[in-house]
Amino acid sequence: MQTKLSVNINKIATIRNARGGNTPNVELSAIDCERFGAHGITIHPRPDERHITTKDTYDLARVVQTELNIEGYPDQRFMDMVAEIKPAQATLVPDPPHVLTSNAGWDTEKHIVELTKLIAEIKRHGVRTSIFVDTELKNIEFAAKTGVDRIELYTGPYAEHFPINKEEAIAPYVKAAELARELGMEVNAGHDLSLENLAFFKKHIPFLAEVSIGHALISDALYFGLENTVQMYLKELV
């Protein structure tokens, strides 16, 4: 199956915010990513607006023609945005506002009641749901109990161990993904996926629904250009 590429454009907003003004233009970047072949756009509008702002979120909702994936900690601000914008997908991540980047998945057993309520609320708006989790099988099992449509596997540990031992790095992800599929959930993945490790990941999880890639893709675009880079990542997912 064709795994979809959702380009995370947080880093483009980070560059813009470092200088002020509107260069690079976040909306145009999203439109261009789609034009170059991306299947979706991912954003993480944090409360401190360090990269994607609330205004960006609403502006992007008006221009994105593929799938808009809004990820974030499900506080009231986030839930209100999801209810108003109704993106294609909402991905719940457990990081509080002060965390630099998402670095862990949900303890779904501990937060089962809260997550179940949140997932039900989001689904009422016709939005596909996803929960950010690690590969601990218990967290996959309890994610399924929430009624969520998909899980997003946190691939930071995979990327870290890939240069050391590829087979050991991928093994827990294969088990987690297969369990998720058995329990009726589709599987997304994201965090530190790159041109170096993406094809190997897809090869071992061929039913992977979607990857969300930002930091590595935008960094590669500095050298290869955005259009070439999007195409390079798409080829890794064939």
What are these regions (language model features)?
Residues 1-71, 75-77, 81-87, 142-145, ...:
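Conserved N-terminal beta1-alpha1 strand-loop-helix module at the mouth
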Residues 76-85, 136-146, 189, 193-208:
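Catalytic cores of alpha/beta
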